[in-house]
Amino acid sequence: MKKSTIQIGLLFTLCLVSIGCQSHSVQMTSGKKYLSGYTSHGSTDANASDLNEEVKAMASIEPSIQFPARIGLVKLFNGRITNLTVDEVEAWEESRAVMGSQFGDFIPVSPMVAEMVYTPKSTHGKSKTSPSDIFRKVRLGAARQHLDHVLIYEVFSETKTTKLASSVANWTIIGGYFVPSREIKTTGFANALLLDVRNGYPYGTASATLNAKEFSASQTYRDKSRNLADKNLVSTVIKLIPEVQKMMKKLMEESKQA
């Protein structure tokens, strides 16, 4: 009930919300079984041979997920680990309660812990952090907190502002502050990936999008645009959580059969 209240409250803070989309998938396939069908073509090309060995190395991992589990939560924004909002923490906790004690716990991975244990491979100060470096940092931070698996979710948005016919009011001092002359549209995106901390096995993915729009006067549309995008991002995460929940339930069922 509390989760529904959080979600409804967030959505109503957005003036107009349209439905986006949601999806999820799970993986529990065996690396050993996958490689049993792997045949060598006897290529004399050194580059092809190296690639074949790399493919084998990437495939040779096994699923080992068991419940209850300690599952870390990592939120990525602008390529960095960031703190969860209060609304997100409450929503994740509600999801954990719905799945019951047989699920385990969601535990946020501390950005400070991740930074403490991570050492960049490159010593160049201006080198850009690559996606592989980010995943490495996440797994190291989660390992230091003794977590079994880690759910990484990244959020970002696209925002567009359009002038309306009423923008003629911008020619007046008062009208520029009070007459709605801009339409702000924003789309929030949230993508999640569940990884095994120990071997990097990808157990599942989930995604969600959410559209929102608002009208604003010309003198205030920049602030309103930022505020709308921020609120919509949190609402997009709230919309992502049910998909993660479905993914987790499937994994709980499949882990019992493994």
Q: Language-model segments: what does each one mean?
A:
Residues 1-9:
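Bacterial N-terminal signal peptides that target proteins for export
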Residues 2, 62-64, 141-143:
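A general structural signal for short secondary-structure junctions and capping/turn motifs
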Residues 10-15:
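Hydrophobic helical h-region of N-terminal Sec-dependent signal peptides
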Residues 17-20:
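C-terminal motif of bacterial Sec signal peptides marking the signal peptidase cleavage site
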Residues 22, 26-65, 157-160, 180-258:
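C-terminal/domain-edge helix-coil "capping" segments
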Residues 50-59, 131-139, 169-179:
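N-terminal post-signal-peptidase region of extra-cytosolic proteins
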Residues 67-160:
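N-terminal segment of the mature soluble domain
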Residues 164-168:
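Short helix-loop boundary/capping segments
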